[in-house]
Regions:
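Generic structural signal for hydrophobic
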Residues: 46-47, 106, 137, 176
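Mid-to-C-terminal alpha-helical segments outside catalytic/metal-binding sites
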Residues: 1-14, 20-49, 53, 232-237, ...
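Active-site gating/metal-coordination segments in enzymes
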Residues: 53, 61-155, 164, 282
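Conserved, mostly hydrophobic/aromatic
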Residues: 12, 74, 106, 114, ...
Length: 286
């Protein structure tokens, strides 16, 4: 990624199949998303035209019935657009040896990190079944993004579409941070209804970060803004959740909230460079 040419780095961008099942329809309604989903190359062109770098991934889950874009396709997209893109992979860590061998293979092929979604993958982040997977990732010092908090996926569906919100509690991630102190962790989203817990985990564990994706900044809780301006100013990351929320919308709303001028470049770019190992220094957690 050619960071010197970028104004920001979006740490949370989905590459998705162009499906339209019930879960997709509910998510579009929740996020007020309109229009067709962008193709992978349209995603690249969107970000390049705005001089924004992005971390791209799909999600390996079977709960919603939405097919995963293969990790290999995401990696190939990022390789073809290496000036602006980094590829993360998604693996279901509850698959035991298969998850471990898949992680090993992906790391050997240069994947830059991993994305996990406990509510959709139906596991607690601190379940010991996932620990062999974490051991491989931690040894390679690759970052892991964990979905935390409420899930827009399933909202409004009968039975929440089967999505159990308990799996999004950031206190589960605290255990992982204790047991794998050399593995950089990004807790995705303002973690409603556990925002205080997420702030505490991020403050307490040096390798834990928070991305601000999935919410318009105008809805950020006051305590999140307070800590982003002060004690967590070097641990908060710009993320949009594109295509559900566009960077255009997110950045316009971000301009209107009371973030200090000297903190804005940290959130928009500099903190991401550090956790992603793009600043030429030893990666966080290493």
């Amino acid at each position: 990624m050619q960071t010197e040419n970028l104004v920001a780095i979006d740490t949370h961008v989905h590459i998705e199949s162009n499906t339209d099942n019930a879960a997709d329809q509910a998510a579009r309604k929740y996020f007020r998303e309109t229009g067709p989903r962008p193709t992978p190359q349209e995603v690249a062109e969107y970000y390049r035209s705005r001089k924004i770098g992005c971390v791209v991934f799909s999600v390996d889950e079977r709960l919603t019935g939405r097919p995963q874009v293969p990790n290999e396709e995401v990696a190939a997209l990022a390789a073809d657009n290496a000036d602006i893109m980094l590829a993360f992979a998604s693996v279901d860590p509850t698959r035991g040896f298969d998850a471990v061998s898949e992680a090993d293979r992906l790391i050997a092929h240069g994947i830059r990190g991993f994305k996990l979604h406990p509510p959709l993958q139906q596991f607690h982040a601190n379940d010991r079944i996932a620990y062999p997977f974490y051991e491989v990732v931690a040894a390679a010092k690759r970052p892991v993004i964990f979905h935390t908090g409420h899930s827009g996926i399933g909202t409004g569906m009968r039975g929440g579409g089967g999505v159990r919100l308990k799996y999004g509690n950031p206190m589960d991630v605290d255990d992982v941070a204790v047991d794998f102190p050399d593995m950089p962790i990004i807790m995705a989203h303002p973690s409603f209804p556990w925002q205080d817990e997420a702030i505490s985990v991020c403050l307490h564990k040096p390798q834990v970060f928070i991305d601000l994706s999935g919410w318009s900044p105008k809805y950020f809780p006051a305590n999140l803004i307070q800590y982003a301006n002060t004690l967590l100013k070097e641990k908060i990351l710009f993320g949009s959740d594109y295509p559900l929320i566009t960077p255009d919308r997110w950045l316009a709303d971000f301009e209107k909230i009371p973030i200090r001028d000297e903190v804005r470049p940290l959130i928009l770019k500099e903190n991401a460079m550090r956790v992603l190992g793009l600043d030429g220094k030893v990666k966080v957690g290493g």
